[in-house]
A protein has these predicted regions:
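A structural signal for short, well-ordered beta-strand segments
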Residues: 17, 73, 98-100
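A short coil-to-beta-strand element that immediately follows conserved catalytic motifs
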Residues: 67-76
Length: 151
């Protein structure tokens, strides 16, 4: 095992949500390493014993002060380590992302978010830093349109 392999510290499980309010998407600017300053969707680590859906609701509330209703599962996204996390480790991460609708509250940055805002869909796609996040946003819109238009 080479030095790079020995620095890999397990697999992290994160849960996030693409939140819609009309034609807008809720995004946050990360406040902590390794992604400080980058725009993304609200999300974070799954706590031991926590249901995935509950984690998505909690993360959105903690990072943005917004209450949501989950529409459905978008998918599971895999991020191989390219940067050290806040603890200095290289971490392989699985993100489980949901589509959601806004219920109440105005975005206010909290927890590890430095900023939170609803922005138009196209602006959200431009602002977010990760191609995986852009894919999650696009997939969430497709799911939302399927759920709201029905068969």
């Amino acid at each position: 095992m080479d030095k790079g392999d020995s620095e890999l510290q397990g697999i992290g499980i994160g849960v996030g949500a693409v939140v819609f309010r009309g034609d807008e998407v809720l995004i946050i600017r990360r406040g902590k390493a390794p992604f400080a300053g980058q725009w993304s969707i609200p999300g974070g680590g799954l706590h031991e014993g926590e249901r995935l859906e509950d984690a998505a609701l909690r993360e959105v509330r903690e990072e943005t002060a917004v209450e949501i209703r989950l529409i459905g599962l978008i998918g599971v996204f895999e991020a191989l380590p390219t940067a050290r996390d806040g603890e200095g480790y290289l971490r392989h991460t699985l993100m489980i992302d949901y589509a959601a609708e806004w219920l109440a509250g105005e975005p206010a940055a909290g927890d590890d978010a430095a900023a939170a805002a609803f922005v138009p869909y196209e602006e959200a796609l431009r602002r977010v830093s990760s191609d995986l996040t852009r894919t999650a946003i696009a997939d969430a819109l497709k799911l939302r349109n399927t759920v709201t238009s029905g068969p």
